[in-house]
Curated annotation (Swiss-Prot):
GO terms for molecular function: ATP binding; metal ion binding; protein folding chaperone; protein-folding chaperone binding; unfolded protein binding. Its main location: cytoplasm. The keyword GTP-binding does not apply. Belongs to the GroES chaperonin family. Heptamer of 7 subunits arranged in a ring. Interacts with the chaperonin GroEL. One of its GO terms (cellular component) is cytoplasm. It comes from Bordetella avium (strain 197N). This is Co-chaperonin GroES.
Amino acid sequence: MALRPLHDRVIVKRLDNERKTASGIVIPDSAAEKPDQGEVLAVGPGKKTEDGKILPVDLKVGDKVLFGKYAGQGVKVDGEELLVIREEEILAVIQ
């Protein structure tokens, strides 16, 4: 199944953070924080203004992005956890 985001939403796959401390202690999944970085998998066409114009999303597929810990809506597609996030919830593009 494929997702096509609407309006100013993007589909993001979380990037796994390192699950070890600097001293080599492995952090179990239950104690690990959700990563706040991800890769953009799909981009919606943009937000419609009051006069009917479309403002395109300023992201592209493949961008690595930063977002808030609780941003977006989680969805499971083909066994993979993805996020549907509004463009305004994305804090920065990692370059």
